[in-house]
């Protein structure tokens, strides 16, 4: 499930939908579109981080993946939230330098939107973690 091909394919799908959404103003027409995009982003980030750990022992040792569920979940969610917060800053800077000059609509709709974005990032990551752990359990059987 965490092959490079799967990770790259999901990233390309997310980027394609995101680019189409920006070009066609879907984020402003269909405000709900932001929810599945953040969910998929969190799902992808968790997938990518677990792939990096299991294949390159980056940024932590591979043995970590087999430790207790709570510790594993907290560390993976921490990496995902770091990426999510970084992307919220990117949205903020986009609004300052691009949207404020009239080139596009605003991406930051306020604190509630930011919190919802981060929540769905984490939810997507948690769903992937759950699927990953179930898959790993069945491999051991």
What are these regions (language model features)?
Residues 1-112, 122-141:
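Bulky hydrophobic segments
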């Amino acid at each position: 499930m965490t092959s490079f091909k799967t990770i790259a394919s999901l990233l390309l799908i997310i980027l394609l939908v995101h680019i189409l959404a920006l070009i066609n103003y879907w984020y402003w027409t269909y405000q709900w579109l932001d929810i599945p995009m953040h969910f998929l982003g969190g799902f992808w980030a968790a997938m990518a981080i677990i792939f990096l750990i299991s294949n390159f022992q980056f940024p932590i040792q591979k043995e970590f993946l087999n430790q207790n569920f709570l510790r594993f979940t907290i560390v993976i969610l921490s990496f995902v939230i770091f990426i999510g917060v970084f992307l919220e800053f990117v949205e903020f800077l986009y609004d300052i330098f691009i949207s404020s000059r009239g080139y596009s609509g605003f991406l930051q709709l306020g604190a509630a939107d930011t919190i919802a974005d981060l929540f769905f990032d984490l939810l997507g990551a948690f769903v992937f973690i759950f699927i990953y752990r179930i898959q790993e359990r069945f491999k051991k059987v």
